[in-house]
Regions:
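Short, glycine/polar-rich helix-capping loops at beta-to-alpha or helix-loop-helix junctions
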Residues: 99, 182-189, 247-253
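Adenosine-nucleotide cofactor-binding segment
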Residues: 154, 170-223
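Glycine-rich beta-strand-centered segment in the early N-terminal region that forms part
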Residues: 24-39, 51-91
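Glycine-rich phosphate-binding loop and adjacent beta-alpha segment
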Residues: 223-280
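Glycine-rich NAD(P) Rossmann-fold beta1-alpha1 loop
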Residues: 129, 156-163, 221
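N-terminal Rossmann-like NAD(P) cofactor-binding module of classical short-chain dehydrogenase/reductase
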Residues: 85, 214-217, 239
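NAD(P)H dinucleotide-binding glycine-rich loop of Rossmann-like/cofactor-binding domains
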Residues: 87-152
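Residue-level marker of beta-strand positions
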Residues: 82-83, 102, 237
Length: 280
């Protein structure tokens, strides 16, 4: 027996608590991992809410990522004692997740933790860090590079994905990073993370604004996505990976047909496994 957070649903409520469970409570997989760390994400918060839209079948062990040590394996790629991590693949959604002392998953979902990275560090990055790195990877695929020092806009600058994105961009050598925040108290935080400039977002109804930015890494969605798209330069590129501001995008077509901008969706759940390993 071991401890796990278990989410249960009644007719009008969702409840969760730490319970004693055994391996029969875990979803199927050919690798059993002793979980050492699991990060807490926005999606995990939704998973614990009634009508959160994340968990469909109850009871469920939440936790959309985890890192730990292989306890046992019938998969040739992994052996007892290996340090590994898992993000995405509906872990903590339809497959029992990381808020447990043990997790069991198919070996195809597992990424070996690089030798130079500790188990703890891998979950300091976690799903948020992986999504941030994946967004940067896509922007660089479409031309963003350190040599040209482009103007980069990042939303959700003090949130999980946005804060890590700014730190990674700054660490690898990008200098012209502008952060979007909603409150004045977030300005200094964003600057400490590596932002050169900080904007407090304001609503506007104009279909197109002066082009300022070459690339836009959006982590928030909805009206914030629109805010950045309208301010991209000719042939600017944007990625979007989050929907904390909402699911709707009431955009107009002008930035696309007059400036030839591109909007790329970022999915960190089912992304190709080879890309996962490259990112980590």
């Amino acid at each position: 027996m071991f401890n796990a957070v278990v989410v249960r649903k009644s007719a009008s409520n969702v409840s969760y608590k730490v319970e004693k469970v055994d391996e029969s409570h875990l979803s199927k997989g050919d690798v059993l991992v002793k979980v050492v760390y699991s990060s807490i994400n926005y999606k995990d918060m939704l998973a614990l809410q009634y009508k959160g839209g994340v968990i469909r079948d109850y009871p469920m062990i939440p936790g959309i990522d985890f890192a730990g040590i292989v306890e046992s394996s019938s998969n040739d790629k992994f052996k007892e004692g290996d340090n590994v991590l898992v993000t995405g693949y509906d872990v903590g959604v339809t497959h029992t997740g990381g808020f447990s002392e043990y997790a069991q998953v198919p070996g195809e979902w597992i990424v070996p933790i690089p030798q130079e990275m500790s188990i703890k560090e891998s979950m300091v990055y976690g799903t948020a860090g992986f999504t941030a790195a994946l967004s940067i990877f896509e922007l660089e695929k479409y031309g963003m590079n350190i040599k040209s020092q482009p103007e980069i806009l990042v939303s959700g600058a003090t949130g999980g994905v946005g804060s890590v994105a700014i730190q990674i961009l700054h660490k690898i050598g990008y200098e012209n990073i502008t952060a979007i925040v909603r409150k004045e108290k977030q300005i200094e935080i964003a600057k400490k993370l590596g932002a050169k400039q900080v904007i407090i977002i304001e609503d506007d109804n104009k279909p197109l604004k002066k082009g300022i930015f070459d690339y836009f890494l959006d982590t928030v969605g909805s009206n914030v996505t629109l805010y950045g798209l309208k301010r991209l330069n000719y042939q600017g590129v944007a990625t979007v990976c989050g929907n904390v501001a909402g699911n709707s995008l009431n955009a107009n077509i002008l930035p696309f047909i007059l400036r030839g901008i591109k909007l790329i969706g970022i999915d960190s759940v089912y992304v190709d496994h080879n890309i996962r390993e490259d990112i980590w």
